[in-house]
Amino acid sequence: MSRKQLALFEPTLVVQALKEAVKKLNPQAQWRNPVMFIVWIGSLLTTCISIAMASGAMPGNALFSAAISGWLWVTVLFANFAEALAEGRSKAQANSLKGVKKTAFARKLREPKYGAAADKVPADQLRKGDIVLVEAGDIIPCDGEVIEGGASVDESAITGESAPVIRESGGDFASVTGGTRILSDWLVIECSVNPGETFLDRMIAMVEGAQRRKTPNEIALTILLIALTIVFLLATATLWPFSAWGGNAVSVTVLVALLVCLIPTTIGGLLSAIGVAGMSRMLGANVIATSGRAVEAAGDVDVLLLDKTGTITLGNRQASEFIPAQGVDEKTLADAAQLASLADETPEGRSIVILAKQRFNLRERDVQSLHATFVPFTAQSRMSGINIDNRMIRKGSVDAIRRHVEANGGHFPTDVDQKVDQVARQGATPLVVVEGSRVLGVIALKDIVKGGIKERFAQLRKMGIKTVMITGDNRLTAAAIAAEAGVDDFLAEATPEAKLALIRQYQAEGRLVAMTGDGTNDAPALAQADVAVAMNSGTQAAKEAGNMVDLDSNPTKLIEVVHIGKQMLMTRGSLTTFSIANDVAKYFAIIPAAFAATYPQLNALNIMRLHSPDSAILSAVIFNALIIVFLIPLALKGVSYKPLTASAMLRRNLWIYGLGGLLVPFIGIKVIDLLLTVCGLV
C-alpha cells in the first residue's frame, strides 16, 4: 500500500519552498552547487554594476544592467526553489511519521519475564538491552525483539496498512518497531537500539538532514558540470580583450550574461532536486531507502534474486492430487494423509484435510478424542505426523521420509521415486506419506504462478536485467516453476550460504545484485547485496543488514524499486542532455548580439532575427531562468519510464531531450524577444 501522494504544487509546500529559496541565497548554501554559485556571483556583480551606472559612477545603460541582474537573481531563486520544493515534499511525507513518536513513558521490567516488577521511566531514556512490558492500548516505546508473549499490533502509522499483524517471540515475526500500537494481549520486548537510533529516528533524520550525501553518479556529473563551467569561464574571460582590441569592448554585464547562458545552469539548478525527488518517490512507494546511493544502485542493478514463494508464486501451496504407491489404493493414502494433517494448521496441512474430504468424503476427526499424539514439523526432521494406537504416520520431504523409512528397516520404493520426479517436473512440490516403514504414496502440492509475472520478467530481460528465482524446492520442481514463470535462472534447495555465494559470484563478474529478505538467516546475503530490501515484518537483523526497508513487506516490491531507481537515473541523464543541447541555441542568440558590432561576420549566426542586441541578450537570460521552473515538475515526477534496451532508451532520449533541447530555446527566445519588443521594453 502506497502513501497518499502529495499534489505536485501543494500551496503550503510552495509557500514554504519560496521562503527556503530566499534563505538559500546566502553564500554558505550556494557554494555547495558550483554552477549556481557562479550565477550567484554574476548576479551580485551585475547588481553592483547597475547601481554604479544608476549613480553615474560608471557609464552605461543602468536599466539594461538592472534587468540582466534581476533575471540572474531569479535564475538562482528558481534553482533554490526546485531543491527546496523537493526537500519540502520529503519532509511533509516524514512529518506523518513524527506524530507516531507519542510515547511519554514506558514500563521497564526489573527482570526479563512477564509479571516482574516494573518501573515507569521516560521512553527516551530506554537503552539497548532494557526490557519493557507493553499491553493492549500501549504504544511500543522502542525498536526491539519480542522475548515473551504474542500480540496483535497496529502498524498503520508506519506502513499505511490498516490490517493488524501478529508479533510473537521466536521465529521471524519477533521484530517490533517503536511507535506502533498494541491492540490485544501483551509483549515483553528487549530494546535493540539506543535513543535517537530507532527506525523512525533514522528515517526522519534521513529525509530532513541538512546535508544529503551525493551519490557517485551525482558526484561524477557535478565534476563534469564544474569542468564545463571552468572552460566557459576561461573562454568568456578571453572575449573581453578580443573585443577591446577590435575597438568595441563588450561590457561586463554582457559577458556575465553570456557566461550564465553558456554554462549548464538548467541541470545545475535541478540536480539536487532530482536526487531528493528520487528518494521521495521511493518513500511514496512505502520503501525507506537509507541513502540516495541505494536508490541510485537500484537503477544500475542487472541481477534480481527473487524468492519463489510470495514473489513469483501466490505462496499458498494447496494439495492438488493423491498419487498412491504401487499396491496402495488412493483412499488409503488420502486417509493416512488426512490423519497426519489433522493438527497441522499450515495452509498446506489444511488443504490436505480438505482434499481428502472432497475426494472421499473423509470427515475431520478430533485428535484428542482419538487419544493421538501429534508430531509437529521441525527444520531438523522436515516432517510431521501423528501417532495413533499402534500406527505411526508421517508426511514430509522425500529425503526426510527416505531416511525415516531406512531407519525403521524399510525400503523406499522405486516407483515412488518415479512419481516424485513426475510431480516435481509438473512444478508441484511432492510430499511423501509413510505408515511405519511402508511408503503409501505422494501428495502433490501445487503453487500458482502469479498472473502477469512472466510478462514483467520479459520486460526486465529487455532492459538487460537477469532474474534468478530462489527456492528451497528440489531442482526438478524449481526448473518447472522457473520455466513457467519465465525467469532466466534459478537456485534450488537454497541455503543462506548458497545465496551468499551466488551474490558474490555475480559481483565478481562485475554485476550489481538486488534481493529481498526478512529473516535473520537472510542478513549475510542482504549485507552483501548492492540493493537489499528488507521486509518491515522481518527481524531486526534483516532490517539492519539491508539498505532499504519495505514497509508493506511485499517481496514483489523489488521490481518497483528497480523501476524507481532507473527512472531517477533516466531523469538525470535526460535533463543533462536537454540542458547541454539548449545551450547551443543560446549561442545563436547571444554571440551575434554581443560581438556583431566588432565582428560583423557574426551576423550570419543571427538566424532567429532577434530585434536588437539588448533584446537578444535579455531574451536568452529570461529563457535561461524560466526553463528551470518549467522543468521542475519533470525533475520531481521523473521522466516517463518504459522498459527498453539500453540502446533503444538512448535513442529515444536523444530524440526527445536532445532534439527538444535544441528546438525549444529557438522558439522560446524568439517568443520572449517578440514580447519584449511589442511591450516596448527594449
Swiss-Prot record:
Residues of the active site: D307 (4-aspartylphosphate intermediate)
One Gene Ontology cellular component annotation held by this UniProt entry: plasma membrane
A single GO molecular function term of this UniProt record: magnesium ion binding
Record-annotated membrane-spanning stretches: 34-54, 62-82, 219-239, 254-274, 588-608, 616-636, 656-676
Binding residues annotated for Mg(2+), in chain numbering: D518, D522
Topology within the bilayer: Multi-pass membrane protein
Domain of life according to the entry: Bacteria
Pfam families assigned to the protein according to its UniProt record, in alphabetical order: E1-E2_ATPase, Hydrolase
Assigned protein family: Belongs to the cation transport ATPase (P-type) (TC 3.A.3) family. Type IA subfamily.
Name of this protein: Potassium-transporting ATPase ATP-binding subunit
